[in-house]
Swiss-Prot record:
HAMAP family: SAICAR_synth. One of its GO terms (molecular function) is ATP binding. This is Phosphoribosylaminoimidazole-succinocarboxamide synthase. SUPFAM superfamilies: SAICAR synthase-like. The gene is purC. The lineage of its organism: Bacteria, Bacillati, Chloroflexota, Chloroflexia, Chloroflexales. It catalyses: 5-amino-1-(5-phospho-D-ribosyl)imidazole-4-carboxylate + L-aspartate + ATP = (2S)-2-[5-amino-1-(5-phospho-beta-D-ribosyl)imidazole-4-carboxamido]succinate + ADP + phosphate + 2 H(+).
Length: 250
């Protein structure tokens, strides 16, 4: 597919203008994988295609569930055509179980279950390690309106429970999930960016020792070719499993 000029580039993707439609953009999924705000980084051949396939599977599923997203189509595994948005510089994190940074902040929360899913906001700022930010601070800093904060909270929980139910059909526990939002040209708020295997914690059978997500890369003391091959295999399995959601949820 023909690509327009580069609009932006991040650690794991490049955003291109659409060659003929100014209301669309094209995401190119790179083969890079990073952790620690980019302090650890490697290239895994084929990872971008798996990320693109997973993102397409997830967004198609959300669209069919009636959730407004920027996803249009995935003409190639590494390319995603989306509605062009102005991104809100926030990570919106939903948690069913305490894990990761939440447990480091609140170790006493171990063993809890959040119902409804807990929603947290983090400012996208690598230099400051994506600090947590409150809804009041989001509004005070002009990042989003009170109505948008409420919509991101409600939609975030809806996205989580929708994907949680799909994963449950495959006996996989969705522990937590990170998403982003953007404003489309008409001002509407859309679930945007990507949702791939870097975006969540997923535990088959509820067992963290069987994790399929990026945490296995974060946890590795030393990253060698065997670790990267293991990461690739897990990402390939997730791309395949998310492709089965439609069949198992009918």
């Amino acid at each position: 597919m023909e690509l327009g000029h580069v609009l932006s580039e991040g650690k794991t993707k490049i955003v291109y203008a659409h060659p003929t439609d100014p209301d669309l953009a094209i995401l190119f999924h790179k083969d890079g994988i990073t952790a620690g705000d980019g302090a650890r980084r490697h290239v895994i051949a084929g990872k971008g295609a798996l990320a693109g396939q997973t993102t397409a599977n997830v967004f198609r599923f959300l669209n069919r569930a009636g959730i407004a997203t920027h996803f249009i189509e995935a003409p190639e595994p590494k390319l995603t055509v989306v509605r062009r948005c102005v991104m809100i510089p926030l990570e919106v994190v939903m948690r069913r179980l305490p894990a990761g940074s939440y447990l480091r902040r609140y170790p006493e929360a171990a063993g809890q279950r959040f119902d409804p899913p807990l929603v947290e906001f983090f400012l996208k700022d690598d230099a400051r390690h994506d600090p947590q930010i409150t809804p009041d601070e989001i509004v005070a800093q002009g990042i989003a309106t009170p109505a948008e904060v409420e919509q991101m909270t409600m939609t975030g929980q809806q996205v989580f429970t929708t994907l949680e139910a799909a994963w449950a059909k495959l006996d996989v526990t969705l522990v937590d999930l990170k998403i982003e939002f953007g404003r489309a040209g008409d001002g509407s708020l859309l679930v945007a960016d990507v949702i791939d295997n870097d975006s969540w914690r997923i535990w088959p059978g509820g067992d963290p020792n069987r994790m399929l997500d990026k945490q296995v890369y974060r946890n590795a003391q030393v990253v060698d070719e065997d670790v990267l091959a293991d990461v690739y295999a897990r990402y390939a399995q997730v791309a395949e499993l998310t492709g089965r959601w439609d069949a198992v949820t009918k």
